[in-house]
Amino acid sequence: MTDTDLITAGESTDGKPSDAAATDPPDLNADEPAGSLATMVLPELRALANRAGVKGTSGMRKNELIAAIEEIRRQANGAPAVDRSAQEHDKGDRPPSSEAPATQGEQTPTEQIDSQSQQVRPERRSATREAGPSGSGERAGTAADDTDNRQGGQQDAKTEERGTDAGGDQGGDQQASGGQQARGDEDGEARQGRRGRRFRDRRRRGERSGDGAEAELREDDVVQPVAGILDVLDNYAFVRTSGYLPGPHDVYVSMNMVRKNGMRRGDAVTGAVRVPKEGEQPNQRQKFNPLVRLDSINGGSVEDAKKRPEFGKLTPLYPNQRLRLETSTERLTTRVIDLIMPIGKGQRALIVSPPKAGKTTILQDIANAITRNNPECHLMVVLVDERPEEVTDMQRSVKGEVIASTFDRPPSDHTSVAELAIERAKRLVEQGKDVVVLLDSITRLGRAYNNASPASGRILSGGVDSTALYPPKRFLGAARNIEEGGSLTIIATAMVETGSTGDTVIFEEFKGTGNAELKLDRKIAERRVFPAVDVNPSGTRKDELLLSPDEFAIVHKLRRVLSGLDSHQAIDLLMSQLRKTKNNYEFLVQVSKTTPGSMDSD
């Protein structure tokens, strides 16, 4: 190598920093005024700071980034460097490929920037992982974010390979693509940060999240007491504060609270909700106020509710305790039912009635008789798909809990009301109480399930879906007498002779499920004879468990006499004899005296 070549090489090194362009970021070495930095957007400033080696840029603001970049430039321009001539002499003596710092232990600020610009992408990826937990909250470690980081790393590696192969002329393109990649990564970090902040804000406000987290109650929060019936759905629960139907003031209950406290559907719950403070903006995504405190379940403590038995594990028995319905001399409906179809605690009775046969009046008389003669029983009247005026009449005439869903409501409301009502009755039975449920009617409930349930593809005659018959049968099958204490009595009406094939199919499904049946006759009702009871097909299974031996023998004689007559003559004879006596006891004594030969014939 001649002296001319050495001089040329030295001039190329000093005058045209072409080799340094591949390693030194030109925008950092250039003396850019502060105004040009102020015009850059935040992702560009972060990318520039990352190339300069500034760490933690994801949490910096714009003015902080500008200050950090200017500090790096001042260190690079004004630092005490090694004598320039000595460096040039050393570079001239060494081969051009060994253009490295004079000492490996110490580096000047300019050389630090060069080395940091070469390692900008690995450091940025590590900085992203380090800043992830602090910047993006609890969601920084999700699988989606890891996938984004892996894809970004692969793209960075490809960019580095292309930049290495292209040489010094493509150094600017490599840095430009690196800047775009950095901006994309920083945008991802910004999105992660926003998601993390939103998640933390939701946790602080007590908004429910996907895992059903409970709402947090602070010391300075003002609470308001609430009470209602718990309705547990698939992944959430509500306290129905306005009855058994959904309302605008229902209270949300997290599934964690339901499982932790052993809460069940139909529980009577009391607790508290947080009252929004003055000037506090309501959460637009939070439609219902969450329950922040649980005080009692079914009038008892929460610990007692965890120890209660399950309704399905209780032992069912035949009814053995009678519910007497006779109230007064002139109330013949209940007197006839006591003689023809005696009812016990835990009975599953059906009142089979054609239209306009007086079934609603019979239900009212039964309800009033139960509240008068058996005040220990909890009475619930469930009216499904009923006329609004009949609901009002029932509420005013019955001293009990009337749960209604009128016919102008959608079928889903009919089914939800019936399900929540029977679940409420089960919760009372688990406490050892006697509950009587009067349902009007099981046929209309079957219609509602047929209209509300999705089609299964198997349609029976009359357009009845096969899956729509099970839920009302489950409702009726809940009636039972519990050996451990408590009972659930269900008296439901079933409509026949309506001219609808679907009603006939529904009735045939329930025909063998009841253990007591009271059949009404339309022809008797057309003669204006009430109650229009068809005596011969009506009766109770295992009625000897409800009647005393003497009473059972006399009733047996009476039914033998009435069986020889047609339905019209039988009810006329029975009604005429009941009007002559003050009560059923006197009537049975009279029957035993007037038919002595029947006992001998037996």
Swiss-Prot record:
Start-end of Polar residues biased regions: 100-120
Keyword terms, alphabetized: ATP-binding, Helicase, Hydrolase, Nucleotide-binding, RNA-binding, Transcription, Transcription regulation, Transcription termination
Comp. bias regions, Low complexity: 172-182
Cell division in keyword set: no
InterPro entries, sorted: AAA+_ATPase (IPR003593), ATPase_F1/V1/A1_a/bsu_nucl-bd (IPR000194), CSD (IPR011129), NA-bd_OB-fold (IPR012340), P-loop_NTPase (IPR027417), Rho-like_N (IPR011112), Rho_factor_ATP-bd (IPR041703), Rho_N_sf (IPR036269)
Free-text comment about domains: Contains an extra N-terminal domain, a S1-like RNA-binding domain and a conserved P-loop NTPase domain.
Name of the protein in question: Transcription termination factor Rho
Lineage, broadest ranks: Bacteria, Bacillati, Actinomycetota, Actinomycetes, Mycobacteriales
